[in-house]
Amino acid sequence: MANSSEVTARAPRPRRGIARFRPWAQTAFLAVWLAPLGKALQLHRIPSCVFHCYGCPLSSLACPIGVAAGFGDLPYFALPLLVIGVLVLVGGLVGSLVCGWACPFGFLQDLAAKIPTPKFRIPGWMGYGRYVVLIGLVILVPYLWGKTHPLYICNVCPAGALEAGVYNMAKQAVLGGPVEWMRARKFVILGVLLVAMLFTYRPWCKVLCPLGGLLALFNRFSIFHLRFKAEECRECNLCRSRCSMGVKVEKRVNTADCIRCLECTTCGAISPAAGRRTNQSSPKRKSPPARARST
């Protein structure tokens, strides 16, 4: 049976790593995405790399998902090359780091998670829902049926309801116009999602976000990545307890389920890295040296 000193040695105190700066980075990026100068400088047509609605009056850049889906409604076949270029560039550089550090809708979910309510974990297999939304609502629906289809991504987008729907409905109310059911439907979806945010961490990011799912595919080969150092692992499970996405970091480092919030780096065995990767798979932990037999 291990004595108290051995238990203490295996459970080090969390380090104050780079993750403590994440709320400040999210706030700074929020100011960038909602900068009024964006429209004045004609930046509104340039796609960003985060999930938000370009219909918001304060939006500075375009939503990459909305732009990509909009190409499907054209009378001729076309590829959103600028969107593809931006996402491949960002994904190849940092992967889903933008989800954890720059996305305004992710920031909203982080703030909601701070409310002290009972929390439950979403099963990992539900993460494939992101690719159902990406292939179905972003690609197939607009190409086959156009923007008028009820399941067109912009017609059910919760970010659109929050960032643009509030303004548009208020404007219609002031002008005396009717509230369209298409916009009201988005508010129902947003309401369900807001309630879910109180009881589980980042439900949109885990289950439905098409952009997060796409960027997560780059995690295994992006220049920025996480490195697991087996020789420094004390099997304290600190990295697991710090991961709100439910990733077994020491076994599945750089998985597509990771938003790279870097909370797991408070454990000394995991650290951010850039450039060449020494080992894509998580190496086996070193077993402690056997005690010498007393004679």
Role assignments for model-derived ranges:
Residues 1-250, 256-295:
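Non-ligating segments of multi-cofactor redox enzymes
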